[in-house]
Amino acid sequence: MTGLEILPAVDVAGGQAVRLVQGAAGTETRYGSPLEAALAWQAAGARWIHLVDLDAAFGRGSNRELLAEIVARVDVAVELSGGIRDDESLRVALATGCARVNIGTAALENPEWVRRVVAEYGEKIAVGLDVRDGRLAARGWTKDGGELFEVLARLDADGCARYVVTDVARDGTLGGPNIELLRAVCAATDRPVVASGGISSLDDVRAVAALVPLGVEGLIIGKALYAGVFSLREAMTAAQA
């Protein structure tokens, strides 16, 4: 199938499905059971789910058993993210049977390790590029991780298969996607890009879908779906427009 793949987000904190504003701890809006959310997105037609352990991302705990249960219970592909920074956390994540993992902070803080795991696992590894004003954010978006395009060039050279690009300032705000950022990343790499952050309307979905020829293959949507701005089915239809 051509077109843009929609990945509904299920972010987990304290065992609950939540959404944050600009990735900031303490801004959570709770949406109940993450397993029920994941099963609901599957029932609505999702082919992928973006599943995040926010507690692990912020270094304040883990929901690993719950995430493993969710991956086991759904029949769709899962992209697993949050706190995957070393061999043990990567082993646990891959052992869930997820389709791929998204590595964020470690790609900035431990480039030698990322080079090794990318070489070993290939398509199973995506690297999250969380961007604020042209700089990369690390450790749950609270620390600076360096200049975006310098890091991107290094990751490309290391053979990274895919990038998940988030504009931190827009995530969870319904403020619209950063199309310029996505264009710039696509121009700088020939690897596929999954976009994330700020989707507020079906027009936003169509705007990102227009970037498919440039290299954008997927779009993560969270708050707009949970807030009922549009349905997953409507988003999937807009993504093929």
UniProtKB/Swiss-Prot annotation:
Keywords: Amino-acid biosynthesis, Cytoplasm, Histidine biosynthesis, Isomerase
GO terms for MF: 1-(5-phosphoribosyl)-5-[(5-phosphoribosylamino)methylideneamino]imidazole-4-carboxamide isomerase activity; phosphoribosylanthranilate isomerase activity
Keyword Isomerase: yes
Catalytic reaction list: 1-(5-phospho-beta-D-ribosyl)-5-[(5-phospho-beta-D-ribosylamino)methylideneamino]imidazole-4-carboxamide = 5-[(5-phospho-1-deoxy-D-ribulos-1-ylimino)methylamino]-1-(5-phospho-beta-D-ribosyl)imidazole-4-carboxamide
GO cellular component terms attached to this protein's record: cytoplasm
Positions of the catalytic residues: 11, 130
Keyword Membrane among UniProt keywords: no
GO BP, sorted A to Z: L-histidine biosynthetic process; L-tryptophan biosynthetic process
Family: Belongs to the HisA/HisF family.
Designated name of the protein: 1-(5-phosphoribosyl)-5-[(5-phosphoribosylamino)methylideneamino] imidazole-4-carboxamide isomerase
Organism of origin: Acidothermus cellulolyticus (strain ATCC 43068 / DSM 8971 / 11B)
Lineage: Bacteria, Bacillati, Actinomycetota, Actinomycetes, Acidothermales
